[in-house]
Design a protein with these regions (language model features):
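Class I (Rossmann-like) S-adenosyl-L-methionine-dependent methyltransferase catalytic domain
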Residues: 2-51, 56-107, 123-200
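Conserved acidic residues
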Residues: 110
């Protein structure tokens, strides 16, 4: 499929993502639930209240909700939110349009699920994102998901340098799991890892 012509160029603004969802140009979308998340949920005895920032179409929302996990998903793109709500059926109310930096979750959180949110934003905003992660999560809570590692200056997706990302996270989070990913979409193939970080 040919890449549509876009006019919005700043991924820090909703308009950038509105255009892409309007044209159904979402090469980052897994169109399902990744294997690492399936295994992680199966390994956890107690449901974890989870926030999914930058949820996009939100396939994981229905999976977590069906598993009995309290879940809240947000996106600042109204077109993305409408797409997610249309796809999620009975779980549509789990998705809201909101700005991650000012949003207050409706429940205390046990986990934030990272899936193509951090890498969607310019690297200059990452310290602010990680500070907000730390504000939202109490000690012992988890930041779990997929982290994109790449040295290209272009994006999105914006890749991280592993030591640099670890340096940003280490003051407030401890790494508990780090594994390669074998079921990535083409946009992330060979360049993402499943990681679980625990709030200090």
């Amino acid at each position: 499929m040919a890449t549509p012509t876009f006019t919005a160029r700043d991924p820090a603004l909703p308009e950038f993502w509105n255009e892409r969802f309007t044209h159904q140009f979402t090469p980052w979308d897994h169109a399902g639930v990744p294997q690492h998340l399936l295994r992680f949920v199966a390994s956890v005895d107690t449901p974890l209240a989870t926030l999914i920032p930058g949820c996009g179409i939100g396939h994981e929302v229905a999976f977590l909700a069906d598993a009995g996990w309290p879940v809240c998903a947000i996106d600042f793109s109204p077109v993305a939110v409408a797409s997610a709500q249309a796809a999620l059926g009975k779980w549509a109310d789990c998705v809201a349009q909101a700005d991650f930096f000012s949003f207050t979750p409706p429940m205390p959180l046990d986990m934030i699920y990272e899936r193509a949110f951090l890498c969607a934003l310019p690297r200059a905003s990452w310290p602010r994102v990680i500070a907000r992660y730390a504000e939202l999560l109490p000690a012992g809570a988890l930041l779990a998901g997929f982290f994109f590692f790449d040295s290209s200056l272009r994006g999105p997706p914006f890749g991280a340098d592993p030591p640099a990302l670890a340096a940003l996270l280490a003051p407030t989070f401890a790494l508990r799991d780090d594994q390669p990913v074998t079921d990535s979409v083409a946009a992330f193939a060979g360049r993402e890892r499943w990681q679980v970080w625990q709030r200090r």
